């Protein structure tokens, strides 16, 4: 054990194990997670080769092999609970992805959400056992987030009771679905449904794309891999072109919308029900943002405690990099954000399951807010985490650029989350549309509920910019309730401004669509403020539920740092709205610096509480034992370029050149 890390852990004011239990949900869940992890670590069937030194084809093959072993072992270990599957995969995959992943994260959930009982009986068992390997083919070359623009068609033929699937243009080719290139034999295809001469919009169809047994593409199907990408080297993101490809009527997922044998269309209760899979994935992306950010943070903070550099006073020993205030200012707000997103991720998961149960019983009342909340928080958390991961890499100095740090792999694996499952700016605008509807409801005298209920205060003059006197003159910057309140005021003010800008443009005889585009920057700002408020509120709510006073105090400091750092970064909003004064902002900035010093003794223990195994981090710099330099040298020796003392290119090109000089 590195002596610096040993000292850091001994100096902590709390037991990290207690926070680990909090993050997992209970001591029993922590015990079970570790039991699963230990089974994997002690199993010789799991060969943990270093993906960094493999070619793309080798990485894909290694990932397929790992997936096959994983399915077999999950059966053997009796792992079926969703949380346990997540723990299993988190350890096994580390910072990489699996080609069969969409079978479990998209294909099966869509089948469960949108398939009839008969359809589930037919396809669910084969897909859980990987006889059917499914993917989710929505995005096309020409359209992604704009679903109404998708061009793939499914035209019903009542004579044969079949749908004819077509990719009518080059831009209609399905493009990007994971596992499509080489792995999947079925896809849930989103296509424009045409029956009795009328288009009824997007619907989901189960489309066989490869022959079971030979795995060859079926006639009428053109399918392949789209080539190298920024990351995701193990994943065969693919393309799919369908030419007059026929599937049985029963292959349309018909839990909500239906097409009768004669071609009659039966519409669903709500069109939003068909977006269930996207809402499901977006709700879980918040947790994924927390996980990726907390991994990067763990690596950067541990390495900053091990690394000694420069001098604070001439002639004195080089201090730990973590002792520099600038390093703390880079990393501790990210640490606080990682914790905030952990709690929001848990809330989103629980909320999704609760509302999904209500939907199953026919109650759709909370669906609009769930749709808006998942869209906005997906964008807010993934953007923030993406920037935070890169900040962690930079905080590791030059070594952060090496794959040995683990952070480049975390970054390139996470960064697509900013554009998949809905491009983030478009997601913010979807939430803004909901906020504008709620704003109009409040203006017409209706009471609204849920996380937007603070907008009920809008009609009172309390949040109008000109009514300065009614704003709180004292903001207690050490009080979670007070901080939550000022984030609420900021959100309400920016929503009010955005709504009035929109109304102003429309009053100039512009159509709502043109007015929307002309005010969209303000609408995104309003959504960002709403999401920021939601995160602050949910973090504050979590503090109240923590029984252990020591743990509550430690996490309260992180809450204060998260909230106050956010105010310092968005000071203009709080000043312009007369929510805070200039002197209060100065106090906030000073308090942020004080909190860095308060959190410093607990920094390593706080990342230890995430309880990541070294294999999950995939980092030489972030090792639990802190023995960085010895392992850095050993890692470099494994580079394939070091297999020979003299590379063959020397004899081919350099030596002949040198001999002629």
UniProtKB/Swiss-Prot annotation:
Site (Cleavage): 468-469
Record localization: Peroxisome
Function: Involved in the initial and rate-limiting step of peroxisomal beta-oxidation of straight-chain saturated and unsaturated very-long-chain fatty acids. Catalyzes the desaturation of fatty acyl-CoAs such as palmitoyl-CoA (hexadecanoyl-CoA) to 2-trans-enoyl-CoAs ((2E)-enoyl-CoAs) such as (2E)-hexadecenoyl-CoA, and donates electrons directly to molecular oxygen (O(2)), thereby producing hydrogen peroxide (H(2)O(2)).
Binding annotation for FAD: 139, 178
Enzyme Commission identifier(s): 1.3.3.6
Protein name: Peroxisomal acyl-coenzyme A oxidase 1
Lineage: Eukaryota, Metazoa, Chordata, Craniata, Vertebrata
Residue positions, PTM N6-succinyllysine: 89, 159, 241, 349, 437, 446, 512, 542, 637, 643, 655
Protein family according to the UniProt entry: Belongs to the acyl-CoA oxidase family.
Protein species of origin: Cavia porcellus
Segments carrying motif Microbody targeting signal: 659-661
Gene this chain is encoded by: ACOX1
Phosphoserine: modified positions: 26, 649
GO annotation, cellular component aspect: peroxisome
An annotated Gene Ontology molecular function: acyl-CoA oxidase activity
Catalysed transformations (reactions): a 2,3-saturated acyl-CoA + O2 = a (2E)-enoyl-CoA + H2O2; hexadecanoyl-CoA + O2 = (2E)-hexadecenoyl-CoA + H2O2; dodecanoyl-CoA + O2 = (2E)-dodecenoyl-CoA + H2O2; octanoyl-CoA + O2 = (2E)-octenoyl-CoA + H2O2
Keywords, sorted A to Z: Acetylation, FAD, Fatty acid metabolism, Flavoprotein, Lipid metabolism, Oxidoreductase, Peroxisome, Phosphoprotein
């Amino acid at each position: 054990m590195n002596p610096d890390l040993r000292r850091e852990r001994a100096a902590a004011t709390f037991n990290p194990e207690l926070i680990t239990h909090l993050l997992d949900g209970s001591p029993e869940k922590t015990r079970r997670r570790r039991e699963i992890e230990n089974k994997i670590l002690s199993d010789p069937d799991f060969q943990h080769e270093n993906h960094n030194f493999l070619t793309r084809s080798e990485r894909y093959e290694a990932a397929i092999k790992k997936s096959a072993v994983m399915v077999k072992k999950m059966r053997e270990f009796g792992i079926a609970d969703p949380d346990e599957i997540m723990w299993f995969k988190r350890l096994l995959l580390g910072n990489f992805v699996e080609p069969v992943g969409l079978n479990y994260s998209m294909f099966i959930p869509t089948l469960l959400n949108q398939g009839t009982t008969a359809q589930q009986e037919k396809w669910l068992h084969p897909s859980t056992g990987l006889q059917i390997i499914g993917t989710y083919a929505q995005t096309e070359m020409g359209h992604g987030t704009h679903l109404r623009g998708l061009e793939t068609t499914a035209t019903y033929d009542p004579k044969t009771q079949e749908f004819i699937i077509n990719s009518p243009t080059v831009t209609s080719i399905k493009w990007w679905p994971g596992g499509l290139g080489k792995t999947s034999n079925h896809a849930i295809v989103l296509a424009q449904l045409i029956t009795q001469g009328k288009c009824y919009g997007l619907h989901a169809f189960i489309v066989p794309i490869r022959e079971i047994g030979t795995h060859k593409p079926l006639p009428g199907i053109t399918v392949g891999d789209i080539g190298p990408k920024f990351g995701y080297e193990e994943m065969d993101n693919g393309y799919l072109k369908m030419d007059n490809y026929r599937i049985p009527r029963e292959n349309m997922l018909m839990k909500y919308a239906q097409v009768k044998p004669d071609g009659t269309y039966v519409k669903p209760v709500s069109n939003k029900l068909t977006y269930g899979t996207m809402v499901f994935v977006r709700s879980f992306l918040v947790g994924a943002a927390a996980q990726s950010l907390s991994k990067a943070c763990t690596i950067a903070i541990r390495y900053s405690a091990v690394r000694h550099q420069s001098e604070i006073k001439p002639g004195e020993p080089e201090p730990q990099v973590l002792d520099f205030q600038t390093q703390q200012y880079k990393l501790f707000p990210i640490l606080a954000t990682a914790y905030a997103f952990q709690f929001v991720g848990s809330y989103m998961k629980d909320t999704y399951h609760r509302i999904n149960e209500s939907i199953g019983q026919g109650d759709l009342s909370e669906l609009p807010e769930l749709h808006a909340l998942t869209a906005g928080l997906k964008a807010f958390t993934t953007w923030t985490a993406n920037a935070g991961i890169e900040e962690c890499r930079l905080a590791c100095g030059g070594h952060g650029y090496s794959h040995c740090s683990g952070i480049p792999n975390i970054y390139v694996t996470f960064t697509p989350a900013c554009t998949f499952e809905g491009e983030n700016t478009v997601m913010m605008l979807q939430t803004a549309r909901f906020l504008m509807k709620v704003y109009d409801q409040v203006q017409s005298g209706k009471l609204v509920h849920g996380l937007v209920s603070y907008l009920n205060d809008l009609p009172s003059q309390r949040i109008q910019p000109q009514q300065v006197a009614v704003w709180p003159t004292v903001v207690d910057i050490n009080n979670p309730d007070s901080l939550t309140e000022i984030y609420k005021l900021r959100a309400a003010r920016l929503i009010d401004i955005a709504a009035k800008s929109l109304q102003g443009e429309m009053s100039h005889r512009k159509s709502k669509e043109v007015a929307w585009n002309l005010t969209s920057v303000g609408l995104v700002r309003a959504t960002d403020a709403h999401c920021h408020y939601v995160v602050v509120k949910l973090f504050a709510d979590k503090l109240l539920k923590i029984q252990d006073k020591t743990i509550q105090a430690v996490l309260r400091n992180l809450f204060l740092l998260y909230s106050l750092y956010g105010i310092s970064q968005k000071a203009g909003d709080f000043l312009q709205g007369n929510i805070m004064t200039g002197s209060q902002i100065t106090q906030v900035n000073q308090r942020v610096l004080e909190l860095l010093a308060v959190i410093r003794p607990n920094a390593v223990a706080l990342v230890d509480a995430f309880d990541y195994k070294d294999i999950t981090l995939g980092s030489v710099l972030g090792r639990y034992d802190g023995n960085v330099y010895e392992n850095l040298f050993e890692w470099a020796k494994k580079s394939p370029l070091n297999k020979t003392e003299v590379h063959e290119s020397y004899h081919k090109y350099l030596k002949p050149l040198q001999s002629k000089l």
